[in-house]
A protein has these predicted regions:
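N-terminal secretory signal peptides that target proteins for export/translocation
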Residues: 1-6
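Bacterial N-terminal signal peptides
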Residues: 7-19
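Boundary at the C-terminal end of the N-terminal hydrophobic targeting segment
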Residues: 20-25
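Beta-strand-rich ligand-recognition modules
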Residues: 28-58, 62-66, 72-74, 80, ...
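Low-complexity, Pro/Ser/Thr- and charge-rich linker/hinge segments at domain boundaries
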Residues: 163-187
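Feature activates predominantly on carbohydrate-active enzymes
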Residues: 183-310, 316-320, 350, 354
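Catalytic-core regions of glycoside hydrolase
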Residues: 210-211, 230, 254, 258, ...
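C-terminal functional modules
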Residues: 479-589
Length: 589
């Protein structure tokens, strides 16, 4: 049966939209490429897509330019230590493997009969001799050395991926380009136990809330312990009078100078006790200057006293960790004044408990600290803020990568120990969810940062456990972190039955999160809306758009069936998106 153009486009979009189906230490690669990145070969004859991989293929020598593929890539600095070419490839289905050659800058890394399997992709590594890799431009060639054959017929050799990396590197799927979740056949301990004598990557590992209620904190404490986390900080919005002023930005809810209601204090005292019961360090925090009609005055002792009373209350409960946040403010951005307030609160805390710790969230809390406004501000904190006070830092940007280079630069300027405030999987109370694994955090930043703290969803704290579990996995053992493995284990650890795990897998794939997209969308990014907009923006897409809506509707029905008493805000988010897509569909078609 011949398929019409419309059906072909529909199938292509359905494939794009609906396809779904023990970690070792893995250093960062020097370079990574898809097979399709190689020039030459037979990709101009037969395309580059095969079994979800971007491939290139070489045929026997008589095929001329189709018998070899080459890749040119730059190297700024050749690292010390042995390096290897890691290939993900497959052989043809002929009776024997074909002969190939692998050359780097003209020097042979391998020549002879390849040992890759026919029919399925496998990986092998080839040692790079000393001196073969050079600074500047390098050329890697993969050639078929068979003397007889023609294009389109065996013998042939097909490459899906190529990486230059140390021996222990493992070729893994690039989740930025191809995100889907494979549920593991085995439920493993999670995070995996560390080898004897090895300490966790980050000493302190946890999350904060996001305008959470006491009930939300209490619900998450056992999960933090389950995932080997040991730190929980209240969101300063939780200390606002949200019960009477739900619009926290209207300068009525932040009443830091007033006593907290007794009922609220009792609720948070229970949160502290539950943390202590589960081995979780509770960190108490406030932000007196955000959306505030009355900012704290460093020159008025009575003003500092009004702020101090809240910290004194918590210290009386046995709390040892405290936070003053001065992020996202528009007034009072004076590093000297901020340091003066923080130093005074810290002095009072240490006077009562020599083990008390304070973390200041500075107004400039992201980037490498070299900006025109950031650097003098941070240099003032370096001089005037007590050296024992930690600083929160969100990474290279408010949302995005966290690199060792930016960490070292920021730390050298601010002059203080750092605690990573990782802005993932936070949605800032916007109608979306970010459910994929945490990505793009350098594996060695734990060497210079003591603590890791995730930032969560607002209302959807139950589904937040899935991405938070991957954060816990990363923070526990960064060197062995595999996001594809981690997200699968996270799902099977929060759901009991195969049907429950499958529906959560599909929900995660629908809302993979802002970090999966390499452009690093903001916290309000909605993958469902974005996917649908791309579908209806393509030609011949009406059937695909209908299928996508139907898929999401079935997902909603399954979620309600499998979890009748859970994930209520999550269900509402999904249902609202479905209705929005239906409205867009009606307008377009």
């Amino acid at each position: 049966m011949r398929l019409g153009t419309t059906c072909l486009h529909t199938l292509l979009w359905l494939t794009l939209v609906l396809s779904a189906a023990a970690a070792d230490a893995t250093p960062e690669p020097l370079a990574h490429f898809a097979g399709a990145d190689f020039q030459g070969g037979a990709k101009d004859l037969y395309g580059t897509a095969y079994e979800g991989e971007q491939v290139n293929t070489v045929y026997a020598e008589p095929t001329g330019p189709h018998s070899a593929m080459q890749l040119k890539f730059p190297v700024k600095r050749v690292p010390a230590g042995p390096l290897f070419v890691h290939l993900k490839a497959r052989d043809d289905d002929a009776p024997r493997q074909c002969k190939i050659a692998l050359l780097l800058n003209g020097q042979a890394l391998f020549e002879g009969t390849n040992e890759f399997k026919p029919g399925s992709f496998t990986t092998r590594k080839f040692a790079i001799p000393d001196g073969a890799l050079k600074e500047g431009e390098n050329t890697l060639v993969i050639a078929c050395r068979e003397k007889n054959g023609r294009a389109g017929q065996p013998p042939w050799f097909q490459v899906a991926a190529c990486t230059i990396a140390p021996a222990q590197y493992i070729l893994r799927r690039d989740l930025h380009k191809d995100f889907w979740v494979k549920l593991p056949a085995e439920v493993r301990p999670f995070p995996e136990p560390l080898p004897p004598g090895k300490a966790p990557g980050f000493k302190f590992r946890g999350t904060k809330g996001w305008a959470w209620t006491p009930e939300q904190y209490l619900a998450e404490i056992p999960w933090l312990a389950k995932f080997k986390m040991n730190f929980l900080m209240n969101c300063y919005l939780s200390m606002f009078d949200l019960e009477n002023h739900p619009n926290w930005g209207a300068k009525e809810a932040n009443r830091w100078w007033e006593d907290l209601p007794e009922a609220k204090k009792k609720s948070y005292e229970q949160v502290v006790r539950e943390c202590q019961k589960h081995g979780i360090l509770f960190c108490f925090g406030m932000n007196p200057n955000i959306a505030s009609k009355r900012m704290v005055n460093d020159n008025a002792p009575e003003s500092v006293d009004l702020l101090w009373k809240h910290y004194a209350w918590m210290q009386g409960l046995g709390v040892k960790w405290f936070n003053i946040s001065l992020d996202d403010i528009t007034e009072g951005i004076n590093a000297s004044s901020q340091a003066k307030v923080a130093n005074e609160i810290f002095r009072r805390l240490r006077a009562k408990d020599s083990e008390a710790q304070l973390i200041l969230c500075p107004t400039f809390y992201s980037g490498d600290g070299t900006g025109e406004k950031q650097k003098p501000y941070l240099e003032t904190l370096a001089r005037e803020l007590d050296r024992d006070i930690y600083l929160f830092w969100t990474g290279d940007a408010v949302v995005g990568k966290v690199t060792r280079k930016a960490t070292d630069t920021f730390r050298s300027i601010c002059g203080h120990r750092l605690f990573l405030w990782d802005n993932y999987p936070v949605n800032d109370n916007r109608p979306t969810m970010h459910l994929g694994p945490v990505l793009d955090r350098d594996l060695d930043i734990c060497e210079v940062i003591d603590g890791y703290m995730g930032n969560p969803h607002c209302k959807q704290n139950e589904i937040n456990r899935i991405p938070l579990a991957t954060c816990a996995d990363y923070a526990w053992n960064p060197a062995d972190y595999d996001p594809a493995r981690s997200i699968g284990q996270a799902i099977v650890h929060v759901a009991d039955t195969p049907a429950q795990r499958e529906v959560l897998r599909d929900l995660v794939e629908a809302y993979p999160g802002m970090l999966v997209y390499t452009s690093y969308r903001g916290t309000g990014f909605n993958a469902v809306q974005d996917q649908f907009d791309r579908i209806i923006g393509a030609p011949y897409s009406r059937q695909a758009a209908m299928a996508y809506i139907e898929h999401l509707q079935k997902l909603s029905d399954r979620l309600k069936q499998q979890f009748p008493d859970h994930y209520q805000p999550e269900k509402q988010t999904l249902d609202n998106d479905i209705q929005s897509l239906k409205n867009k569909f009606a307008v377009k078609y």
